Amino acid sequence: MGGFTSIWHWVIVLLVIVLLFGAKKIPELAKGLGSGIKNFKKAVKDDEEEAKNEPKTLDAQVAQTKVHETSEIKSKQES
């Protein structure tokens, strides 16, 4: 009684699928599923290649910001 080990379980499952989708629709569903998996694998591969080509570090300069003290701000607001 360990799940779907009997051939009759699989026959019933396949019969229900045929009844739900129809015999003509099943190949279309399988084709769509196959192309979806193929596109997913291609996208994963492209992302991995893109990650390999990206630089490891960024060569950028960080802008220094001036920190204003509260006394400087008050004097500027009063003038």
UniProtKB/Swiss-Prot annotation:
Gene symbol here is tatA
Source organism per UniProt: Helicobacter pylori (strain Shi470)
Output compositional bias ranges, type Basic and acidic residues: 66-79
Keyword set, alphabetical order: Cell inner membrane, Cell membrane, Membrane, Protein transport, Translocation, Transmembrane, Transmembrane helix, Transport
- Enumerate the transmembrane spans: 1-21
Oligomeric form and interacting partners? The Tat system comprises two distinct complexes: a TatABC complex, containing multiple copies of TatA, TatB and TatC subunits, and a separate TatA complex, containing only TatA subunits. Substrates initially bind to the TatABC complex, which probably triggers association of the separate TatA complex to form the active translocon.
One MF term in the entry's GO annotations: protein transmembrane transporter activity
Q: Name one GO cellular component term.
A: TAT protein transport complex
Locations listed in the record: Cell inner membrane
**Region feature Disordered, mapped onto this chain:** 48-79
* Membrane protein topology class: Single-pass membrane protein
Location (main, coarse): membrane
* Name of one Pfam family that matches: TatA_B_E
Q: What is this protein called?
A: Sec-independent protein translocase protein TatA
Q: Which NCBIfam families match?
A: tatAE (TIGR01411)
Which GO biological process annotations does it have?
protein transport by the Tat complex
Family membership, please give it.
Answer: Belongs to the TatA/E family.
Question: What is the recorded function of this protein according to its Swiss-Prot or TrEMBL entry?
Answer: Part of the twin-arginine translocation (Tat) system that transports large folded proteins containing a characteristic twin-arginine motif in their signal peptide across membranes. TatA could form the protein-conducting channel of the Tat system.
The record's annotation in InterPro entries points to: TatA/B/E, TatA/E
